[in-house]
Structures are given as structure tokens and as C-alpha cells.
């Protein structure tokens, strides 16, 4: 899977193409993020988009983990949607690649580190959830 990373400015200053080893579930999360980015006319995929992508599939390991911890999933989804709706709209990138914010790019790197930490060759949704949780502290 290829990703475009941008600077924190509204226009693309720097483009780097990276390849990550991702599970099918994590690939689906990122596909959902791309769709959400396009629907909401966002300039890039933010951490909020990544978290919303994790919350999209109720059968995912990340969702099962959050549900077992009695996390208020629907309330969390509504808060994230409200934050995304409040963001300034931008022209959509012409590429089919994912355009990641610097923060999201860093989170995906942390996701890979989480996978390696647990001896996994492929990063999955749980690794992304762990990366988000570790990063929020």
C-alpha cells in the first residue's frame, strides 16, 4: 500500500512514498479513511480519521477490545465526526494514494513498532489502537 505524506501546511510540500506490511483488516481501516477523507473533503488523513476507521468495523479485534473495556463507542464516533465536520474543507488530492498528516504517518510508524514489539510480521488494527493509546499518553 502506498501513502503520500504531506507537511502540516494545507498544500503538499513534500511527498514520500512508503510501503508498509499491513493486515487485510488494517488495509480496510485505511480504505475507510480514504473514503471518509474524500466524503468530508479533507486535505489529509488525520489521527481522528484513523480512529474512526478503527471504529467502523464492529467485528475487528480493536472494536472487540474497546467493547470489552466498556468504551462508549457511539459517543466516541459522534465526537470524532463532529471534529471532522468542523475542519476546513480542502480540494481533494488527485492521486488515489492516501494522503497522511504528519501525525498519522508517525502513528503508522508506531503501529509497525508495536507489531514488531509483539513479534508480528504484519501490523493489524490492534497495533494501530495500541499506537494511538501510547501516543495519547
Predicted regions and their residues:
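Histone-fold recognition with a strong bias for associated Lys/Arg-rich disordered tails
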Residues: 2-137
Amino acid at each position: 500500500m502506498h501513502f503520500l505524506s504531506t507537511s502540516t501546511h494545507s498544500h503538499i510540500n513534500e511527498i514520500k512514498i512508503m510501503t508498509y506490511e499491513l493486515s487485510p483488516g488494517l488495509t480496510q481501516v485505511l480504505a475507510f479513511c480514504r473514503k471518509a477523507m474524500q466524503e468530508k473533503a479533507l486535505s489529509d488523513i488525520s489521527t481522528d480519521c484513523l480512529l474512526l476507521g478503527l471504529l467502523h468495523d464492529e467485528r475487528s479485534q480493536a472494536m472487540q477490545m474497546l467493547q470489552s473495556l466498556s468504551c462508549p463507542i457511539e459517543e466516541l464516533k459522534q465526537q470524532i465526526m463532529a471534529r471532522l465536520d468542523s475542519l476546513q474543507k480542502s480540494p481533494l488530492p488527485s492521486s488515489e494514494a492516501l494522503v497522511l498528516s504528519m501525525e498519522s504517518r508517525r502513528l503508522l510508524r508506531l503501529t509497525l513498532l508495536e507489531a514488531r514489539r509483539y513479534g508480528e510480521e504484519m501490523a493489524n488494527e490492534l497495533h494501530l489502537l495500541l499506537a494511538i493509546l501510547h501516543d495519547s499518553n
